[in-house]
Amino acid sequence: MNLPTVLCIIALILGVRSAKNGFFTKLGKPIVCDDINFVGNYCQTKCVKAGANNGFCCQQKCYCLGLNDYAPTLQVADSSEKACQAMSG
């Protein structure tokens, strides 16, 4: 067998997991964070519960980091997405 074939087989066995960032949605609506829960770990808790690695409040919505590819996310303008990605470090 050649090397690419072996690498593909190993990847399938290990189960390659991809991650994405975005505003997680539940029933088509984003998780809202307002002035009361902007500070603290409200969004982190909500995002981790949704399967993400982390999360924070950005533009009054919870922005999740490390969601799986199949997690539903809100479609937003590129400028909004870039602003939240910049805040994530």
UniProtKB/Swiss-Prot annotation:
KW ATP-binding (keyword) present: no
Signal peptide: 1-18
UniProtKB keywords: Disulfide bond, Ion channel impairing toxin, Neurotoxin, Secreted, Signal, Toxin, Voltage-gated sodium channel impairing toxin
Disulfide bonds: 33-57, 43-62, 47-64, 58-84
Role description: Binds voltage-independently at site-4 of sodium channels (Nav) and shift the voltage of activation toward more negative potentials thereby affecting sodium channel activation and promoting spontaneous and repetitive firing.
Family per similarity comment: Belongs to the long (4 C-C) scorpion toxin superfamily. Sodium channel inhibitor family. Beta subfamily.
Protein name: Neurotoxin LmNaTx28
